[in-house]
A protein has these predicted regions:
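N-terminal export and membrane-targeting signals
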Residues: 1-6, 21-25
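C-terminal motif of bacterial Sec signal peptides marking the signal peptidase cleavage site
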Residues: 12-15
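Exposed beta-sheet edge and beta->alpha loop/turn motif
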Residues: 79-134
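Bacterial signal peptide processing site
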Residues: 17-19
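Short solvent-exposed beta->alpha transition segments
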Residues: 45-89
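Short, aromatic-enriched amphipathic alpha-helices that serve as compact interaction elements
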Residues: 23-43
């Protein structure tokens, strides 16, 4: 608990967000962009965060309700072979579950971003399948 307090105090005094302290400025940007994406998608708004050449299945607004940004990381092609050809630079898992899911239901699980001159844009979304509720 003391460690968290020190991190929070450092973030406050330096003007940085906690996400910037933990994940660095680039990781914090991925988290912030993902929160914007979830907000856009869960309200049914068209998001300006989608790359022109995106292959992402965006699903329905209800698929996004209850989700939030997880942990950002630089893209790892060995783990995400399907997305490697799309040349993303970042991936982030989504945390939480949309309401009313039952085993076998699918939901957005990971978002893949490409860096552009305008900022990050979504190039793909990997959907996860709920195995068990409990």
């Amino acid at each position: 608990m003391v460690g968290f307090t020190v991190v929070a105090l450092s973030a406050t005094l330096s003007g940085c967000s906690i996400d910037s302290v933990i994940w660095g400025p680039d990781g914090a940007r991925v988290i912030q962009t993902t929160e914007e994406l979830v907000d856009d998608m869960s309200t049914g708004e068209a998001s300006g965060l989608i790359c022109d050449e995106s292959v992402a299945d965006l699903g329905e607004a209800t698929d996004w309700v209850g989700l939030s940004a997880g942990e950002p990381e630089h893209f790892v092609a060995d783990y995400w072979e399907k997305q490697a050809a799309l040349d993303p630079q970042w991936s982030i898992n989504l945390e939480g579950l949309p309401e009313g899911l039952s085993p076998g239901s699918t939901y957005p699980g990971d978002v893949f971003y490409r860096e552009t001159d305008e900022g990050l844009c979504v190039i793909d979304i990997a959907w996860s399948t709920l195995v068990d509720v409990g």
